[in-house]
């Protein structure tokens, strides 16, 4: 792997960490900064949003559901494992990983927790844009395990 490829790979690994940190620590307030204007956000077989406005709507809907929970708070932590990065061009890449989400209503520490809220296979198509930043063109999450508290199902209307 040449130096440019190593650099791009590290930048994409940092993108993964920064993205999930935005969700876990900032309530997804700036999440659309991680997406291209022409993005797609796909969750499962029947949920597909287009553009930054669609992504923003999803996270705004999520915030409305959180506001109805205990203390109006939901603690989340997203963990990415088994990361694979395939550079498909100088400015394009496919990123695959397993995302393990822990989530619970109320202030930390969440008590009586039994396990992950969701485990998903995640696929990102990424593009480095003119400003040099990598962004998501496509976010596709395929849930493999869903915990007993189906919060995300409520957000998705399921």
Question: At which residue positions do the language-model features occur?
Answer:
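Short, glycine/acidic-rich beta->alpha junctions
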Residues: 11, 77, 117-118
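Extracellular loop and loop/strand-boundary signature of outer-membrane beta-barrel proteins
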Residues: 110-111
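Extended, composition-driven regions rather than compact fold-specific motifs
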Residues: 42-44, 84, 116, 120, ...
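Beta-strand elements of well-folded, non-transmembrane domains
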Residues: 101-105, 126-128
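Short beta-strand edge/turn micro-motifs at domain boundaries
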Residues: 92-96, 117-154
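Carbohydrate-active catalytic/glycan-binding domains of CAZyme proteins
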Residues: 89, 114-115
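A solvent-exposed, acidic/Ser-Thr-rich amphipathic alpha-helical stretch
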Residues: 28-102
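Short, low-complexity N-terminal intrinsically disordered segments enriched in polar/charged residues
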Residues: 1-25, 29, 33-37
